[in-house]
Amino acid sequence: MQYHPWRWLAAALLALNIASALAANAPRVRVTTSMGQFVIELNPERAPLTVANFLRYVREGHYTDTLFHRVVGNFVIQGGGHAASDMRLKPAHDAIFNESGNGLQNKRGAVGLARSDAPHSGNAQFYVNIADNPDLDPVATRWGYAVFGRVVEGMDVVDRIGAVATGTVGPFKSDAPIKPIVIQKIEEIDAAAAAAPAPSAPAPASSGAGPALPPLPAAPSSPAH
């Protein structure tokens, strides 16, 4: 997907306009998966463009019945791009500007925008860090991976997904959960609703099969589509 700077400028203006309204009450979304639920608190103040982009996909229902197609133990889980029905990559909007310089770090529980080696190539796929991953943060000589939120409830579900058995499945050459992990839906919730505990998922089957985490670019330490 090509990065168009002029489109980013227009999108950035819109994102900045809504950021101030959202920042006071950080928006939250509930991710319902075949292994349980977890809640993400978004940070529109630090990552206005990326949050607006993510919420666009949420509101369009893009994530319904998609996969956590890549799981890397002690690293990340990644998903939101491939349909659960046929494992094909779903159409997505244009890529957005990389907001990795926003000061948010890829620490355990942080949620970021997956991309390819090209710095401004992220669109729909996201990942959750299941460990501290400073190698994904930007440095003076290269772009990082943009964090735009954090898991505030249900990290145990994320950990269970991160522990499933993986291998070669369909089009995925490695790191794909042997037993597909489906994102059944992602929905916006208010702060009051978020305070209610999410239902726990049943314990994983004794087979150990489970979800997968996000695909990374050439570097083994980075999330990509």
Question: Where are the regions that the model predicts?
Answer:
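Cyclophilin-like peptidyl-prolyl cis-trans isomerases
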Residues: 2-6, 13, 18-225
